[in-house]
Amino acid sequence: MIIPQRKMDFANYYRTALLYLACIDLASMSDEERHRRAYYLSVAALVSNSIYNFGELLLHPILDVLAQSEDDSWLRDLLFAFNRGDLAAYDVLSDHISENRLLNEHSTHLRQKIYLAALTEAVFRRPPHDRAMTFTTISQETKVRPEEIEHLIMKALSLGLLRGTIDQVDEVAHITWVQPKVLDMKQVGNLRKRLLDWDSSVNQLGNWIEGAGKDVWAA
């Protein structure tokens, strides 16, 4: 199976290929076939203009083939960089993008895609009660120019990656929801830190209430 490049229907290829893999035993495929399918699936996911969540592919064992490849392990790394909105990792891997014909042809789209990923990651890292983000903050976290921030947010809202509203006067985005996604170990570590910070805050509040209220409580 090859990517139907003439039709540029990468999303359809991606979904069809994953459905096919769900119906077969990977052990029945040759190493070459597994590698080819993992490669094409990864490229299709990246260049598609409608796929922004790679969770199903990241969890699929066929992707392990790329991790074992000296030539194409970077492609797996690139998928995970997109998943966590890692701009630094994207820049490190940019040489591989320019050397790959299909990815290079979609380089502008890929850059916009990583900016969107950086935006959703920035929102995800913040607690639900602290998701009113100024355009300046978003610009700093996504490396997008200030004059392009409103368009970036509107794009994320239109794609269903975020939900919320934009205050154009004060230049603030009020985000109420961010699309769930698969977390890698670095993201799990960040989530653990947030939970520990929250637990510490709750304990401090409990100690303060206990000290301030002493034995007098009103119901």
How would you name each of these model-derived features?
Residues 1-22, 26-219:
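Charged, E/D/K/R/S-rich low-complexity terminal regions of large eukaryotic assembly subunits
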